[in-house]
Regions:
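Solvent-exposed soluble domains appended to multi-pass membrane proteins
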Residues: 1-227
């Protein structure tokens, strides 16, 4: 949930959260403006550019984390930038979102700070639109739905083949992201995750997803007590 995300950031170091209410205070949107979850991703990218310009103006390392929502269930939000290329709103929203993130990344690449900045694009889950929906009609029945992840301008050395056709999970993104930032990880494992750049087998590759899922479903009162 959004509240869980806020808790994670507010309980770790000194994150400054720029939310919907901040957008109104800063004049990006009118006081009574609200669409979908608050405001569309077009405004998010405008705000992000301003934040990046401010953050990169100092010599200190910085982190900017963004959450896009235009493609969220059930049909996504069709903003003014979206074209009617397809006969389904959701398909048009996805195409529009793809173009916006592409334009944003290309903008970053033109900035001076890009040379020592790593970009991580990560999905939190596959789309929640039911597979019986007509939007999937052009896909083969054997098509395997996956979460989109990519890392651009990683600050680590690796062999190209270790990033291809891997069986991994969200847990592996933790050490992989840190490795992409130049962090040296002893053993290339953190928690249940494996640094994908290392070429070492992930737990799904080593033990199989069936076993991993079975073990993760086990209950532990002490562990649950932390939450």
């Amino acid at each position: 949930s959004i509240l869980s995300v806020i808790f994670i950031f507010t309980s770790h170091k000194d994150f400054h959260i720029e939310d919907y209410n901040a957008a109104k205070k800063e004049g990006f949107i009118a006081p009574d403006y609200k669409v979908f979850w608050g405001h569309e991703d077009e405004i998010l990218y405008k705000r992000a550019k301003k934040q990046l310009e401010q953050l990169s103006s100092s010599d200190k390392p910085f982190n900017l984390t963004m959450l896009t929502v235009d493609t969220h269930f059930p049909r996504g939000y069709k903003c003014r930038l979206c074209k009617d290329k397809y006969n389904r709103q959701y398909a048009n929203v996805i195409a529009c979102a793809d173009q916006q993130i592409y334009d944003f990344v290309e903008w970053i690449k033109k900035q001076d700070f890009y040379k020592n900045t790593t970009i991580v694009i990560a999905g939190d889950h596959t789309t929640m639109v039911d597979t019986s929906d007509p939007i999937w009609s052009n896909l083969n029945n054997n098509y395997k739905r996956t979460v989109y992840n990519t890392i651009i301008n990683a600050d680590c050395t690796y062999k190209e083949n270790v990033t291809e056709n891997r069986d991994f999970s969200t847990m592996d993104m933790f050490p992989t992201t840190l490795a992409a930032l130049g962090v040296q990880i002893d053993g290339n494992r953190l928690g249940l995750g494996t640094n994908l750049f290392s070429g070492q087998k992930t737990l799904p590759e080593k033990l199989g997803r069936g076993y991993i899922n079975q073990e993760l479903k086990k209950n532990d009162k002490e562990y649950n007590g932390f939450y």
